[in-house]
Regions:
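Non-catalytic accessory segments flanking P-loop/AAA+ NTPase cores
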Residues: 1-240, 245-478
């Protein structure tokens, strides 16, 4: 009898242990989900558990408190009139447990493997950085060289042993180039090749703290999110602020410039290096969201813009240096110079409306060339992830070969130049012409090859479509 009792007790203990182990495994495998917004704990932050095992995220809890605090009179009035409203009852939390959907927890995403410790020996030299950029970016030779050296020096500064006597300044950059010349693409490619987190923001959305719009510190919050909330990784990342020319100082205005000069002034400490408190898993600071401190001292800032009126300022400066008798000739010469931006000076940028202190924190200034027809044709064909290679691969999956005539590529490049939006026009043009082809091909398994011709691009004919094993055109677009 005693042995049997011991056996039963042992079985019970084992069951308890298994249950405990199972619960522990569940906790490790699953995460809580907010009852109101349905975001998991990894996205919304640590959950607040209410009676009945109801999980609420900090954001939703804060919004509930804010709503109650805004209209206390209305809530009191409703409470006083409860007896006169027989069909309405108070919200009972205890009854919620029966209404909660089963899916209150979701599986945790597998944790990413920790990246290798980065050291000064791992920093690729400038010629290797440029060689990697060459595989993806066509042209812009000087811009790629300047960026390669600046990035190399920046990360040397970050990972080199500290020398108390010499402090190396940050290599923040200002790139100036026409729309569609590849500013954003260059930065994206650079960050991907170096495997560092990247945050891209638009300067037009930034305003001085306290005004409607994104405050200046929000750019650091985006970088922290890009680094999966890993502060150390974020502190070695890159922030790209596009359309920086849009925050130039406004001229002849008596109103406070909250989205121009004030934003430039507000960014000074950020560019130089300071401790910034940013919310984790939320877009704005509030009492219920945990904050992380991010130091921007080792974050590389790259600003870019088209600066559309800057060429007029450069022309005016160059003409002032010429004698009166030659001014007309020089003006005509500069009017035809598509790469006039390459002669920009800091004085020109100050005249444009950029604050001197702001420019002082962007020591490396360089320009990008305007894209010509030859460069656009190269962009279509040559990079590792060229647009044509992507479409060829898509048709390969349908076992169809895709080719483009050289004249067709020239015609596409000319159409892109007419749109005056640079390389970004190429994809939309090709997508437009490929739509019908990609729609029709899966219908007919006998099609073996499609050749895009100049006539098709210029809408005077159709593509050449060949049957499998045949050399004779099958269909022409009407």
């Amino acid at each position: 009898m005693s042995e049997e009792k011991d056996r039963v007790d042992g079985t019970a203990d084992e069951t308890k242990a298994e249950t405990k182990s199972s619960d522990h495994h569940t906790e490790d495998t699953y995460e809580k989900v907010c009852f109101m917004c349905r975001r998991p704990e990894s996205k919304a932050g640590k959950m607040i558990t209410l009676p009945g095992n109801i999980n609420i995220c900090p954001d939703c809890m804060q919004k509930s408190f804010d709503t109650m605090n805004q209209n206390p009179g209305q809530i009191n009035e409703m409470m006083n009139n409860m007896n006169n409203m027989p069909n309405i009852g108070m919200f009972d939390l205890s009854g919620l447990s029966n209404q909660i959907p089963n899916r209150q927890r979701v599986k945790k995403k597998e944790e990413k493997k920790k990246t290798k410790e980065f050291s000064i020996k791992d920093i690729p030299p400038p010629h290797r950085i440029k060689a990697m950029l060459d595989e993806y970016v066509i042209g812009q030779e000087r811009a790629k060289k300047v960026m390669s050296v600046a990035v190399y020096n920046h990360y040397k500064r970050v990972f080199a042993p500290q020398d108390g006597n010499i402090e190396i300044e940050k290599s923040n950059m200002l790139m100036i180039g026409p729309t569609g010349s590849g500013k954003t693409y260059l930065v994206q490619t650079l960050a991907r090749l170096l495997d560092v987190p990247l945050a891209i923001t638009d300067a037009t959305s930034l305003t001085e703290a306290g005004y409607i719009g994104d405050d200046i510190e929000s750019v650091v919050s985006k970088l922290l999110a890009a680094a999966d909330n890993d502060v150390e990784r974020a502190e070695h990342g890159i922030i790209f602020i596009d359309e920086i020319d849009k925050i130039a100082k406004k001229k002849n205005t008596n109103q406070r410039d909250v989205s121009g000069e004030a934003v430039q002034q507000g960014m000074l400490k950020l560019l130089e290096g300071s401790d910034i408190e940013v919310p984790v898993g939320a877009n704005s600071k509030n009492a219920m969201v945990p904050l992380e401190t991010v130091n921007t001292r080792n974050i590389l800032f790259i600003c870019g813009g088209a600066f559309p009126d800057l060429t007029d300022i450069i022309k005016e400066r160059l003409n002032k240096t010429a004698s009166i008798g030659f001014q007309a000739d020089l003006k005509d010469k500069y009017d035809g110079d598509k790469n006039l931006l390459s002669q920009v000076t800091l004085e020109d940028l100050r005249t444009f409306g950029m604050v001197s202190e702001f420019l002082g924190r962007l020591p490396i200034v360089f320009t990008l060339e305007s894209l010509n027809e030859d460069m656009l044709v190269e962009i279509l064909k040559e990079p590792k992830n060229a647009i044509l290679k992507q479409y060829k691969r898509l048709l390969e999956l349908d076992e169809v070969k895709l080719e483009f005539d050289d004249d067709a590529l020239r015609s596409i490049a000319r159409k892109a130049l007419e749109k005056d939006t640079g390389a970004r026009a190429l994809r939309s043009i090709i997508e437009d012409f490929m739509l019908d082809i990609m729609y029709e091909i899966p219908k007919d398994s006998s099609i073996g090859e499609v050749i895009i011709t100049k006539d098709y691009i210029e809408k005077t004919g159709g593509p050449t479509i060949l049957l499998r094993g045949q050399e004779v055109p099958k269909l022409e677009q009407k």
